[in-house]
Amino acid sequence: NCPAGCRSQGCCM
């Protein structure tokens, strides 16, 4: 899982 906000920045795929 990715921290909140990371997913929207595309740093976690």
From Swiss-Prot:
Tell me what PTMs the record reports for this protein: Contains 2 disulfide bonds.
Q: Which UniProt keywords apply?
A: Calcium channel impairing toxin, Disulfide bond, Ion channel impairing toxin, Neurotoxin, Presynaptic neurotoxin, Secreted, Toxin, Voltage-gated calcium channel impairing toxin
* Localization of this protein: Secreted
What is this protein's function?
Omega-conotoxins act at presynaptic membranes, they bind and block voltage-gated calcium channels (Cav). Reversibly blocks calcium current in the dorsal-root ganglion neurons of the rat (high voltage-activated channels but not low voltage-activated channels). Does not modify the voltage dependency of activation and inactivation.
Q: What is this protein called?
A: Omega-conotoxin Cl16a
Transmembrane ranges, per UniProt, are none
Instruction: Give the GO cellular component terms, alphabetically.
Output: extracellular region; host cell presynaptic membrane
Q: Does the keyword DNA damage apply?
A: no
Organism, scientific name: Californiconus californicus (California cone)
UniProt GO molecular function:
calcium channel regulator activity; toxin activity
Q: What does the entry note on its domains?
A: The cysteine framework is XVI (C-C-CC).
Source superkingdom:
Eukaryota
Expression sites by tissue: Expressed by the venom duct.
Name the principal localization, coarsely classed.
secreted
